[in-house]
């Protein structure tokens, strides 16, 4: 298709250009084209070509629910064909054709990039799934080799730690629960008394080869023995330094008698009082026999003798006070409230009787009348004074009201009252002599 344009000036010049119609690709493979729904929505209506200009937003790609799973299955079947079968991938290739260009390098058979997914060559073999896992062991569960040397003050030097291939992981609590805490913590046994090497053994911890395996406490002992300060002359030459050996349990309980015990009689107050009473009785018997009382110390010092005598006297006084308290406690069979009748009589002896003389002589039976005459407030008649004061106040109030009324009445009578045209004065006398 060609077109020609000419300029209208003096020097005629012609410009020509050619337009070629580009055939558009099929609509299934295009991702940026849109179909016009109305003539007003697009500038060019003919077009599914990539050169078409559109104002609408392109549709975003959405995956189907099983598309991600199928892509992962195809990826795994390509990377590991011996483990994952490719049946699912062949069925789903038609469904994932629109998005296959994203995973093209990974799904290609001749691409070298698939080697990146295989870090180990043994994964290609199907026997890899049936190999047992290799158990790594720490150095606290390994066996040790000890070499005795006579020259060292340490006496034993640990050469190396060997990692054993097998470890009995059976439950200690299920097998050795009858042996107590020794089955868990182990027992410390002195293997060589001259070298001072100790071994910590746990019953039941035996390898399949027949050798007793070291437990954690034994490894801790060995690690502490490696310390040069513990082996030096300044150290304490303990298998576990820093007081850790005292935390281990001994072989047996034969040294339990060395533990400090507390006598129960020293704590109990009743037994202590009985002891003091018995001691006092023995002191009295010795005094009656004429013997000297000696508690502790030498007899030669006179000062000590004086101190002893004072101690005995204090013991005697304490015993007497205890006896008195016991007697009083035995006498108090009822309630602990005790009325001091003598003290009450002495307190009221100086005061006069609350009953007046008239009632004292009369032998009336009316108790209420007698109680009415009792002066409860005998201190200068406080209640009577208050009653009199109230009465006077009330009387003066009434008197003042009466006086005020009379004064008002008098003033009203003195004022002239007018009733119509007549004026009457109170001082004016009528002809009849009446007001």
UniProtKB/Swiss-Prot annotation:
Q: According to the UniProt entry, which residue ranges have a biased composition of type Low complexity?
A: 29-49
PROSITE patterns in alphabetical order: CCT
- What span is annotated as transit peptide? 1-59
State the UniProt keywords alphabetically: Chloroplast, Nucleus, Plastid, Transit peptide
One Pfam family named in its UniProt record = CCT
**What InterPro entries does the entry give?**
CCT_domain, CONSTANS-like_ZF
Q: What does this protein do?
A: Responsible for specific up-regulation of the translocon genes TOC33 and TOC75 in leaves. Involved in the general chloroplast protein import pathway regulation, including protein import and protein translation efficiencies.
> This protein is called what?
Protein CHLOROPLAST IMPORT APPARATUS 2
| Taxonomic source organism | Arabidopsis thaliana
Name of the encoding gene:
CIA2
